[in-house]
C-alpha cells in the first residue's frame, strides 16, 4: 500500500540521522523545515498510511518523533550517534506525557523500525476491518462450558496490572486476569473505596493419591474447585474478599475482544507485557512485535501449556502466516546451528562416508509436523528407553555418551510386581497349535525350521509347513535342550494322566449353569414351592441362630470353594476347563459361565441375608440380634476363614439401602450389642472399602486367604450380561481407573497363585465335618428355591434381581414406615 502511494518519492536519502515526520505541504515547499517545524509538534502516525497533521498547543513528546514514515521526505535535524550494531536504532528511554502515560520503546539492537511499523500497521489495518470476525470469535469463546474460564467475559487473560486498574472505575467493578509475575496463577482486580486492589487467588493442589490430585482455589476462607464457582459465590453472596480490606465485588467488567487479540495486544511474557502495556484508555498504542530471535524465543518459552492459539502456528506442514516468514527462517537457521533446538522425537543420524546427505532447502518454509522418510538410506533409530517429552541432547555423532535421563516427575500408575510364581513355566500361558500338538508327544521335537533361523522359519511358512505358532508375532525359539518348553504340558500334569499320550484337548465351553434348582433334592423344600414360604424362612432362621458363627463360616467356605472350583476338582473337570483351578478359569474367555455362577451365588447370598433381617416378624430386639449374628459371621469369614468372597456378600447385604434405613434397628444394636456395633463401624466397613479399592494386599496376608475377592473382576468382565442395582460403589469413585487397574492386577495374581489358595483352604478346612442341614441352607440352589420359588428360579437374573429389590423395599417400609411427608411424596 505504501509502496504504491509514495513510489515517486526519493528513497536514497541518508539514514544516519534522526528526522521528524513532515507534512505533505513541506514536500512542496522550498524553505527549510528547521525554521518552522519542531520535532515534537506532531501527533501519532496514523496506522492507515495517511500523513500526519500539525497539532496546536503545547507540543508533547511522542514516540513518532523517533522514526520516519516510509515514503516521506526526511529533513535533517541534528547529527546522530552511530551505533556499533545498527545505523538507525532508536534510543531506549521511557517518556511521560501530560496524562502520566508511560511509553517504553524497543531495544536499540533490533531491526529497522520503519519496516516493523509498516508490518504492524498492516496487521492492525486488517484486524480493524474485520469486526464481525472478532465478534464471532468472542461469541465462540463465551459459548464454551461454564466451568471453562474462557467462557466468562470477566476473564481478561494476560493483561498488565496497569491496564486492569484502568478498567475498574467504580466500587464493585472487578475482573480476573492471569498473574504476570507468577505464571499459572490468577489475580482478581477490583475497585473498592475509590482504590484499585489486587487479590491473588490462592491455588492449592490436594494430592488424593500418587496418581490423582485436585486443584482448589480460595481467597481466605472457603475453597472451590473452579474459579467460576469462586466468583459466583463472592458475587452472589456479597461476601468480602478479605476481612482486612472489606472489598465486595458485584459488577463484572467484560472483555469486548477475544483473548487472542488481548494476548497479541499486550504480549505473553511478563517482562514484555509490562514494557508494552496499553495504558489509560489508549487501545491504539500497541506493543510492537519483535522480529529478532530473542523475541521469538522469549514468546515461545513463556506461553502457557494450554495455549491453543500458539499451537496452531506450530503445527502442520505449512506456515500459519506469511508475515512471520523471516521469523521462522531465522528460527530454522538457529535450529540448524544449535543443538538445543533439535526437534523433539527425532534423531539426526550420524554422518558417514557411505551416506550422502542432501543440503537443506533454501525455502524459508520448513516442516514442523510429521517427518516422512525422505531417503531409504537413512535409518531411523528409536531408543528403547526414550521417555515421552524428553528433549534430545546433541547428535549421535558426538563422542561423549548422553547423560542418563532424568526421572519423570509426572506420577503414573504402577502395576504391582508379579510374585515369583510367575517365573514358573506352569503358570505361563502358551499359544497352542492343536494340529501340531496332537502329533507331538513328550519326547517329540520341533521341526528343524523352528530350531533354525528366522529365514528358515519364513521359508517353512511359505511351504505351508506346520509350525509351533499360529500368530504373526515373532517369538524367541529356544534350542533343543532338556528344559521344558512352554507349548508342552507340564511334567506333573503328565504324571497325573491329565492328557493321555500328551495330546492337547480343547477346553469345553460351558453354556449351562452348574446350579439346577429344579433338580435339587432338599430335605426342607417340596418338589414345587412358592417364593418366601413362611415355614421355610423360620426353619432357616432357626438353623442360622442356633449355630456358632465359626461353624456357619466353615460351611460357607466349604461351599464357596466348590462353587469357585478351588477344592473338589476332578481330573475330568481339569481336562474340560483346560486349567487346574476355577480361579484361573474366570480370567479366561471360556470361563463365562463360571463367572455368571459366581455372580449368582454372591447376589443370592446377599439377598438371603437381607431377607433374614427384613423377613423377621418378631420384635425390634430380634432384628438387632440377627444383625449382631451376621456381623459375627462376617468377622469369622474375614479373620478365621479368609473367605473374602462371602465376606463381601454379607457386607453388601448390611449396606443395602433397605437395611441402612432401619434407624431403630441399628440404634437397638448399638444399645444391646455395643461391641459388635463398634466392630462393624471401625473394622469391617473400612476393611470392605479397602477390598473394593483393590488394596487388600496392604491389609491381608496372602497366606491367610482361601477365597479371594472375586466380584470386582467378574463384574467387570460380565458388565454387559449382568447388572445388579447399577454400578458398584468403587466405580463411582474419583480414582475408579486406578482401582480397576488394581483389580485387574489382582486377577493376574489370583491366576498365578491358585495353588496357594487351594492349600490355604485345605489347611483351614482340615478336620471339618459338615452338618447336613446347615450345609443344605448354604447351597445356592436352596437359596434360589427359597427366595424365588421353583418357577421363579428359572427366570433371567436381571429380572429376578429387579423384582426382588422391590420386595425388599416393601419389607423395609413395613417394618419401619417412612415419615408422613415422604410417604405423601
Curated annotation (Swiss-Prot):
Stored Pfam families: RasGEF, SH2
Domain Ras-GEF, first and last residues per copy: 548-818
SUPFAM superfamilies given in the database record: Ras GEF, SH2 domain
Molecular function terms, GO-annotated: guanyl-nucleotide exchange factor activity; kinase binding; phosphotyrosine residue binding
N-acetylalanine PTM sites in chain numbering: 2
Effect upon mutating residue 744 to E: Weakens interaction with BCAR1
Residue list for modification Phosphoserine: 32, 78, 83, 182, 290, 358, 363, 375, 471
Protein name per UniProt: Breast cancer anti-estrogen resistance protein 3
Species: Homo sapiens (Human)
Gene transcribed to yield this protein: BCAR3
Amino acid at each position: 500500500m505504501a509502496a504504491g502511494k509514495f513510489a515517486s518519492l526519493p528513497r536514497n536519502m541518508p539514514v544516519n540521522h534522526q528526522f521528524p515526520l513532515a507534512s505533505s505541504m513541506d514536500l512542496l515547499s522550498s524553505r527549510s523545515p528547521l525554521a518552522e517545524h519542531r520535532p515534537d509538534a506532531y501527533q501519532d502516525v496514523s496506522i492507515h498510511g495517511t500523513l500526519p497533521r500539525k497539532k496546536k498547543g503545547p507540543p508533547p513528546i511522542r514516540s513518532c518523533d523517533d522514526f520516519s514514515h516510509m515514503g516521506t521526505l526526511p529533513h535533517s535535524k541534528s547529527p546522530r550517534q552511530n551505533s556499533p550494531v545498527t545505523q538507525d536504532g532508536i534510543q531506549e528511554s521511557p517518556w511521560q506525557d501530560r496524562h502520566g502515560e508511560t511509553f517504553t520503546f524497543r531495544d536499540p539492537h533490533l531491526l529497522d523500525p520503519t519496516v516493523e511499523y509498516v508490518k504492524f500497521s498492516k496487521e492492525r489495518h486488517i484486524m480493524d476491518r474485520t469486526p464481525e470476525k472478532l465478534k464471532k470469535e468472542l461469541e465462540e469463546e463465551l459459548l464454551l462450558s461454564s466451568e471453562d474460564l474462557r467462557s466468562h467475559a470477566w476473564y481478561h487473560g494476560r493483561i498488565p496490572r496497569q491496564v486492569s486498574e484502568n478498567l475498574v472505575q467504580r466500587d464493585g467493578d472487578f475482573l480476573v486476569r492471569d498473574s504476570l509475575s507468577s505464571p499459572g496463577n490468577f489475580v482478581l482486580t477490583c475497585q473498592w473505596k475509590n482504590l484499585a486492589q489486587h487479590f491473588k487467588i490462592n491455588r492449592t493442589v490436594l494430592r488424593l493419591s500418587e496418581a490423582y490430585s485436585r486443584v482448589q482455589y480460595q481467597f481466605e476462607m472457603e475453597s472451590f474447585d473452579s474459579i467460576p464457582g469462586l466468583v459466583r459465590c463472592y458475587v452472589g453472596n456479597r461476601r468480602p474478599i478479605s476481612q482486612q480490606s472489606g472489598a465486595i465485588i458485584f459488577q463484572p467488567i467484560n472483555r469486548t475482544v477475544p483473548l487472542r487479540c488481548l494476548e497479541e495486544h499486550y504480549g505473553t511474557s511478563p517482562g514484555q507485557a509490562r514494557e508494552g502495556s496499553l495504558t489509560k484508555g489508549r487501545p491504539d498504542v500497541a506493543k510492537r512485535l519483535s522480529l529478532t530471535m530473542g523475541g521469538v524465543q522469549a514468546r515461545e518459552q513463556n506461553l502457557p501449556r494450554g495455549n491453543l492459539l500458539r499451537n496452531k502456528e506450530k503445527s502442520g506442514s505449512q506456515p500459519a502466516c506469511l508475515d512471520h516468514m523471516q521469523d521462522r527462517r531465522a528460527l530454522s537457521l538457529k535450529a540448524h546451528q544449535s543443538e538445543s533446538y533439535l526437534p523433539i522425537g527425532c534423531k539426526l543420524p550420524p554422518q558417514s562416508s557411505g551416506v550422502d546427505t542432501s543440503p537443506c532447502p533454501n525455502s524459508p518454509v520448513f516442516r514442523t509436523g510429521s517427518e516422512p522418510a525422505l531417503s531409504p538410506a537413512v535409518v531411523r533409530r528409536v531408543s528403547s528407553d526414550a521417555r515421552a517429552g524428553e528433549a534430545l541432547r546433541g547428535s549421535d555423532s558426538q563422542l561423549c555418551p548422553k547423560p542418563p535421563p532424568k526421572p519423570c516427575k509426572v506420577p503414573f500408575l504402577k502395576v504391582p510386581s508379579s510374585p515369583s510364581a510367575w517365573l514358573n513355566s506352569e503358570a505361563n500361558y502358551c499359544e497352542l497349535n492343536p494340529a501340531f500338538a496332537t502329533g507331538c508327544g513328550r519326547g517329540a521335537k520341533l521341526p528343524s525350521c523352528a530350531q533354525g533361523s528366522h529365514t528358515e522359519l519364513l521359508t517353512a511358512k511359505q511351504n505351508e509347513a506346520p509350525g509351533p505358532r499360529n500368530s504373526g508375532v515373532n517369538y524367541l525359539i529356544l534350542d533343543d535342550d532338556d528344559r521344558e518348553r512352554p507349548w508342552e504340558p507340564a511334567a506333573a500334569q503328565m504324571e497325573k494322566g491329565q492328557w493321555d499320550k500328551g495330546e492337547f484337548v480343547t477346553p469345553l465351553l460351558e453354556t449351562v449353569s452348574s446350579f439346577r434348582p429344579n433338580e435339587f433334592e432338599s430335605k426342607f423344600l417340596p418338589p414345587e414351592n412358592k417364593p418366601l414360604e413362611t415355614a421355610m424362612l423360620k426353619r432357616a432362621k432357626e438353623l442360622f441362630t442356633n449355630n456358632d458363627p465359626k461353624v456357619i463360616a466353615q460351611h460357607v467356605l466349604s461351599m464357596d470353594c466348590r462353587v469357585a472350583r478351588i477344592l473338589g476338582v476332578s481330573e475330568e473337570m481339569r481336562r474340560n476347563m483346560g486349567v487346574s483351578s476355577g480361579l484361573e478359569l474366570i480370567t479366561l474367555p471360556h470361563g463365562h459361565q463360571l463367572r455368571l455362577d459366581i455372580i449368582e451365588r454372591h447376589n443370592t447370598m446377599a439377598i438371603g441375608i437381607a431377607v433374614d433381617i427384613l423377613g423377621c416378624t418378631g420384635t425390634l430386639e430380634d432384628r438387632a440380634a440377627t444383625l449382631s449374628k451376621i456381623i459375627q459371621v462376617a468377622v469369622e469369614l474375614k479373620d478365621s476363614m479368609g473367605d473374602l468372597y462371602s465376606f463381601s456378600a454379607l457386607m453388601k447385604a448390611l449396606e443395602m439401602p433397605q437395611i441402612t434405613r432401619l434407624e431403630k434397628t441399628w440404634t437397638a444394636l448399638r444399645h444391646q450389642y455395643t461391641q459388635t456395633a463398634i466392630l462393624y463401624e471401625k473394622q469391617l466397613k473400612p476393611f470392605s472399602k479397602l477390598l473394593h479399592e483393590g488394596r487388600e494386599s496392604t491389609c491381608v496376608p496372602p497366606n491367610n486367604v482361601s477365597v479371594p475377592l472375586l466380584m470386582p473382576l467378574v463384574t467387570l468382565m460380565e458388565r454387559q450380561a449382568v447388572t445388579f442395582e447399577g454400578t458398584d460403589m468403587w466405580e463411582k469413585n474419583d480414582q475408579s481407573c486406578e482401582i480397576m487397574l488394581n483389580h485387574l492386577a489382582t486377577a493376574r495374581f489370583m491366576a498365578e497363585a491358585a495353588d496357594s489358595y487351594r492349600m490355604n483352604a485345605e489347611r483351614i478346612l482340615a478336620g471339618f465335618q459338615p452338618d447336613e442341614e446347615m450345609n443344605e441352607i448354604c447351597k445356592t440352589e436352596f437359596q434360589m428355591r427359597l427366595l424365588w420359588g421353583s418357577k421363579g428360579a428359572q427366570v433371567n437374573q436381571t429380572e429376578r434381581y429387579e423384582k426382588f429389590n422391590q420386595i425388599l423395599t416393601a419389607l423395609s417400609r413395613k417394618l419401619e414406615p417412612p415419615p408422613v411427608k415422604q410417604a405423601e411424596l
